[in-house]
Amino acid sequence: MAGLFYFCRMEISTDVKNILGLQLPSDPRWVNLARLKLEEILTDHAYCEQKAATTCISLITKNPEKELLVDELSPIVTEEWGHFRMVVAELKKRKLQLGKQRKDEYVNNLLQFQKKDGSPMERFLDQMLIMALIEARSCERFKRLSEGLDDAYLRNFYRKFMESEAGHYTLFITLAEHYLDKKIVRKRWAEWLTYEKKLMKEMELRGDRIH
């Protein structure tokens, strides 16, 4: 997995790992629906990786003075784009088509909770926590796919992605705590987890999307 699945070089404490708990697991029926829509799931997954890469580029260009952030996110950009290519290759191998990118209801709803009138550092914190949350939910969904798909190759394929996303979401929390007080980060993270739980309850269950 070296070279394909990057794990952050920063030391991530057990304390950080322990706070990263989604409050609501995915509905078990989701993976059953996803089995029936592999082309749509792989297409959506490819665009999730593309958006992750471009968002990391945006974070770097908006925060060039944050040296540690630049150092840690630069390899993530390369990795996420590599993931995009891997998923597209999987589509081609199966003689499936990369469809058009669709509106991401999950992410758009997360953005509604982002502080619009806070200080620059408050807005930065929310950007980091949104990324952490997206990676955490992706990790959870990839775990579902790695356990619930009929295709053994795809189960292993998604297990590798699950391991990668686990390293990513802890990285965003660790970076946030590097630049802001840990108590502030933990408090806001708890608020985000509560909001995401509510969001997951309200969203329509769909098998054609990763989120």
Report residues per predicted region.
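N-terminal amphipathic/basic-hydrophobic helices that include classical n-h-c signal peptides
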Residues: 1-9
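Non-heme di-metal
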Residues: 10-211
